């Protein structure tokens, strides 16, 4: 039966689940159900066999945001708030803050974490949430077309859809790295790469920024004792690009602090093009971070770095997407590059939330991969978690994780301990070789993905990750942001690096004989015999 124009406003009963062999029974009469993603253009087949999409299209003068407002159903009763992280025995057990409060640290100076009303969410079985999230995939219905906001109840449940700032981020590709696993990793047959860099600004930072900028958009429309005039961040490149794009979409001023000459030109041009105020500072990321924290304490500028835990709520949806893409089966390993270390905790939050609410029955083991030139977490791990020391990060091709004093160190430790996780490092040569080798099997990886891949090579060599282990490598950014490092590698223009997988272009005279000589040689290298037929 064709859907009606008001289908989005309908509540729906819990559907029978294909995921559970023993469906749970409970009283749902008092519950308000979240909505499936349907819109006025949804429709089935007409009696004549033609579709009815045109008949049920929204009015021409109405956009998808206005359509969502018109068809909005009753509000659900889910909520979230800030709590100190991690909870301490000597802290105030009642300390919590509204998400509408502009606050970044607890009274003791520690981090904050977004906590959800898990009791309210748990009133619905895991099968319900699986079916709900699956029903929203591939839609343009506002705001559920986003991979983040399709899981709105797990992200920012209280925000009005009209306040959401989305560029339809997420829903990124999870692809089977068949040849890399088979030929270069000892016959791994279940190796996957989660392409978080295939997003609006080319990195996973979009997932967190849509959540943060949406909340800022909400706050700017509310009566505040201290208005928010803009949003600011320190960045190694990708955060500034994401913040600038989302602020531009919402008409909110963006201010970014960048370490001079330490990010790629592709990363630099993104905030410039999106109209942000860009400050180039003669310091490293950690120096930029100290300055932005001082500035946001004095000026009405909202802090957008991962010190602000709102971003992690969006980033955790990548973990839920992985579960969806495996039909709610849990991988054995997930390998994540780590710099400021918020992302590994975000992945843990996503997996653990799904486990706690019954969507899955376990969480994967996590691996955090660091560049050896910026490896404070690796050193802490190797000390048995007994001696953390920040450091001055050395230059690395994986510039986005060139961080020596990570804000989210405590978060990362919690995630790794809870998942029996591992920390591994990669030298500059190891990460560049891993990147090049992956590219030769069909990828176009960024250097940070190269760090994660190099960690995978090491863990396979050590026998820690098995041949048949389902393993996901998280690719955090698009390779096109880091082309100079690839150019230098294939030109063999990197000091003290062999560049063993370099594939430089071949200069050839523009005549048939010269071209044929080169191709004969190359094809012989490939083990190919060519036959030249002369007529």
Where are these regions (language model features)?
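PLP-dependent amino-acid enzyme catalytic core
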Residues: 2-535
């Amino acid at each position: 039966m064709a859907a009606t124009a008001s289908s989005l406003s309908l509540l729906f009963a819990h559907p029978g689940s294909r995921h559970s062999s023993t469906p749970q029974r409970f009283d749902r009469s008092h519950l308000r159900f979240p909505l499936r993603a349907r819109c006025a253009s949804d429709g089935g087949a007409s009696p004549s066999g033609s579709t009815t999409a045109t008949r049920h299209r929204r009015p021409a003068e109405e956009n998808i945001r206005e359509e969502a407002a018109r068809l909005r159903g009753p509000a659900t009763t889910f909520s979230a708030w800030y709590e100190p992280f991690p909870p301490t025995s000597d802290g105030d057990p009642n300390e919590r803050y509204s998400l509408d409060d502009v606050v970044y640290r607890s009274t003791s100076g520690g981090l904050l974490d977004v906590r959800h009303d898990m009791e309210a969410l748990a009133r619905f079985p895991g099968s319900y949430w699986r079916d709900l999230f699956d029903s929203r995939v591939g839609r343009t219905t506002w705001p559920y077309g986003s991979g983040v906001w399709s899981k709105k109840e797990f992200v920012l449940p209280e925000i009005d859809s009209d306040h959401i700032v989305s560029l339809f981020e997420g829903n990124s590709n999870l692809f089977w790295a068949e040849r890399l696993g088979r030929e270069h990793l000892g016959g791994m047959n279940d190796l996957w790469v989660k392409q978080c860099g295939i997003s609006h600004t080319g990195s996973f930072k979009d997932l967190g920024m849509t959540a943060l900028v949406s909340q800022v958009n909400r706050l700017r429309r509310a009566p505040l004792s201290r208005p928010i005039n803009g949003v600011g961040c320190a960045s190694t490149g990708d955060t500034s690009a994401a913040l600038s794009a989302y602020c531009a979409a919402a008409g909110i001023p963006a201010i970014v602090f960048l370490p001079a000459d330490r990010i790629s030109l592709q990363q630099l041009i993104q905030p410039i093009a999106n109209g942000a105020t860009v400050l180039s500072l003669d310091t490293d990321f950690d120096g930029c971070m100290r300055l932005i924290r001082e500035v946001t304490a004095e000026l009405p500028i909202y802090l957008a770095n991962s010190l602000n835990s709102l971003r992690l709520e969006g980033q955790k949806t990548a973990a839920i997407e992985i579960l969806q893409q495996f039909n709610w089966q849990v991988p054995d390993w997930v390998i994540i590059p780590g710099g400021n270390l918020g992302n590994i905790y975000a992945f843990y939050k996503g997996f653990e939330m799904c486990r706690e609410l019954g969507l899955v029955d376990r969480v994967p083991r996590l691996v955090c991969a660091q560049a050896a030139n910026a490896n404070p977490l690796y050193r802490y791990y190797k000390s048995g978690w007994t001696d953390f020391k920040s450091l001055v990060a050395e230059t690395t091709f994986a510039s986005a994780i060139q961080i020596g004093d990570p804000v989210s160190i405590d978060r990362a430790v919690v995630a790794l301990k809870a998942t029996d996780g591992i920390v591994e490092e990669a030298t500059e040569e190891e990460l560049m070789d891993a990147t090049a080798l992956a590219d030769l099997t069909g990828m176009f990886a960024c250097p940070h993905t190269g760090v994660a891949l190099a960690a995978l090579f090491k863990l396979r060599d050590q026998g820690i990750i098995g041949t048949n282990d389902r393993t996901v490598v998280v690719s955090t950014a698009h390779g096109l942001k880091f082309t100079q490092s690839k150019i230098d590698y294939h030109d063999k223009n990197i000091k003290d690096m062999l560049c063993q997988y370099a594939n430089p272009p071949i200069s050839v005279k523009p005549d048939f004989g010269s071209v044929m000589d080169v191709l004969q040689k190359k094809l012989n290298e490939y083990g190919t015999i060519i036959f030249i037929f002369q007529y």
